[in-house]
């Protein structure tokens, strides 16, 4: 199976990752990792995507998770801009539809897994079920789950299901790379304010995003447990500093 490329931002596989110890700013001055560095990596990605398509034995799944305003959309656009669109597909997962709620929590992402020879990108993912839903457990009331819900065990059970599915995919040729774009609370606030102050960014502002800031510590706890439970050599997590967007995009590339 595929094994994780080494990186200073690789979440360890032994469950010792700490959100508090994860940097939101570059570990270097960032200069070597901007501009030319990202463009060179993007060119390499384009070439490698053609090799992937020609081989038709493997697929690549890129998963992006982050707090609001971390830069998921812009990072995906920036990193993948040189890749042949016919070999790449992006799916953004919002609130589940009624059809999706008629299935298990992994169904909607399973249906969108990339075929052999293609790159699939999840902008948010099945991990919402152990992040947003964990912070707001009342959502479980609308998920049509059988029997009584045990909040003491359901999150570990869901993380186990995700972990097992990822191992199954890896054994069958899917290369999985997961990125947590780690933005600080102060930088998130600055970006929210810029969405109000700058007319061309007004459309990005959502009042609910501000409400979610009240649950920041709960989210950090949920992220810490999720990353520790599911970072494995065949499906690694990378905690990428997100306060400096150009650096973040370069590191993802």
Predicted regions and their residues:
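Glycine-rich phosphate-binding loop of ATP-dependent small-molecule kinases
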Residues: 1-253
């Amino acid at each position: 199976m595929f094994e994780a490329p080494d990186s200073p931002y690789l979440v360890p596989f032994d469950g010792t990752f700490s959100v508090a110890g994860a940097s939101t700013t570059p570990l270097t001055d960032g200069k070597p990792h901007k501009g030319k560095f990202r463009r060179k990596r993007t060119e390499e990605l384009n070439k490698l995507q053609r090799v992937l398509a020609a081989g038709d034995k493997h697929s690549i799944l890129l998963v992006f998770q982050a707090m609001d305003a971390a830069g998921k959309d812009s990072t995906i656009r920036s990193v993948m801009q040189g890749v042949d669109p016919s070999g790449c597909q992006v799916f953004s997962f919002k609130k589940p539809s009624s059809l999706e709620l008629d299935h298990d929590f992994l169904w909607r992402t399973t249906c969108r897994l990339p075929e052999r020879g293609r790159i699939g990108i999840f902008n948010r993912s099945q991990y919402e079920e152990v992040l947003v839903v964990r912070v707001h457990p009342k959502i479980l009331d609308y998920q049509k789950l059988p029997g009584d819900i045990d909040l003491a065990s359901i999150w570990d059970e869901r993380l186990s299901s995700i972990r097992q599915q990822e191992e199954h995919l890896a054994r069958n040729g899917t290369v999985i790379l997961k990125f947590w774009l780690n933005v600080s609370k102060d930088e998130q606030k600055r970006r929210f304010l810029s969405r109000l102050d700058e007319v061309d960014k007004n459309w990005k502002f959502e009042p609910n995003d501000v409400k979610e800031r009240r649950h920041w510590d709960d989210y950090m706890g949920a992220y810490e447990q999720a990353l520790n439970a599911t970072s494995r050599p065949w499906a690694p997590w990378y905690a990428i500093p997100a306060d400096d967007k150009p650096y973040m995009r370069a590191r993802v590339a």
